[in-house]
Amino acid sequence: MSDISYREINANGFWHNNPGLVQLLGLCPLLAISGTVVNALGLGLATTLTLVASNVTVSLIRHWVRPEIRIPVFVLIIASVVTAIELAMNAFFHELYLILGIFIPLIVTNCAIIGRAEAFASKQPIPKALADGLAMGLGFTCVLVALGALREAVGHGTLLADAHLMFGEAARGFSLTLFEEYRGFLLALLPPGAFIALGLLIALKNIIDARLQKRQPAQAAVPVEAAG
C-alpha cells in the first residue's frame, strides 16, 4: 500500500471504493440528511473536513502511537475535529446547523472515518493521507449531493431551495423550480424513498462498471497487425 499512486487514491475515493456506493458506510446520515441538496452538501463538506483533518493528524503521529492504544487515540482525534467543526457551524451557519442537528456529532461514529485512519492514514505519509481524506470525503459528498438532488427534485420539484443557509442571502436567487404547481411526492422525502434513491445510484454505478469490464476484454482481444 505504501507505493499507491495519487491517481489510485483518487479513483478509490471517487469510484472504486466510494464510501457511499461501495463500502455502504455512514448510511444513517446519508439517508437522513439527503432530503435537499444544501443539507447534503453541508454534511458532506463537514465529513470531508473531518476526514482530511483526522487523516493528516493520524499520519503525523503514527510513529508515536503504540499499537495497543491506537483505536482510542484515533477516536479522540476524530471527536476533537468534529467538535471544532460543530462549533464553527453553530457560529457561522447557525440555521443549517439547526437542521443538521445530531447528525453533525454523529460524524464521529462514521465507520468510514475511523476506517481510513486505521487502514490508510496510520501507514502513509502526510501528503498521501491528506489526498486519501480529500478523495474519500469528496466522493462521499458527491453521493450525498446526487442523492439530495434526486430526492429534492422528485419530492419538492426544486433544486437549491435553501441555498441561502450556506451561501448567504445573496444565494436566494440560486433556487430552481423544476415543475410549476408541483404538489410534491412525499415518498421521495421519507426514509423508504432515500433507500430507493440510493439503490438506484448503486445500480447505475454497477451498470457502468459492468459495461467498462465488457469493453476491456473486447479491446484486449483485438489482434495487433504485424508491421510490414
UniProtKB/Swiss-Prot annotation:
One of its GO terms (cellular component) is plasma membrane. It comes from the Bacteria. It is a multi-pass membrane protein. GO terms for biological process: electron transport chain. Its EC number is 7.-.-.-. It is found in: Cell inner membrane. InterPro entries: NqrDE/RnfAE (IPR003667), RnfE (IPR010968). Keywords: Cell inner membrane, Cell membrane, Electron transport, Membrane, Translocase, Transmembrane, Transmembrane helix, Transport. Belongs to the NqrDE/RnfAE family. PANTHER family: ELECTRON TRANSPORT COMPLEX PROTEIN RNFE, ION-TRANSLOCATING OXIDOREDUCTASE COMPLEX SUBUNIT E. The complex is composed of six subunits: RnfA, RnfB, RnfC, RnfD, RnfE and RnfG. Part of a membrane-bound complex that couples electron transfer with translocation of ions across the membrane. HAMAP family: RsxE_RnfE (MF_00478). This is Ion-translocating oxidoreductase complex subunit E. It comes from Thioalkalivibrio sulfidiphilus (strain HL-EbGR7). The gene is rnfE.
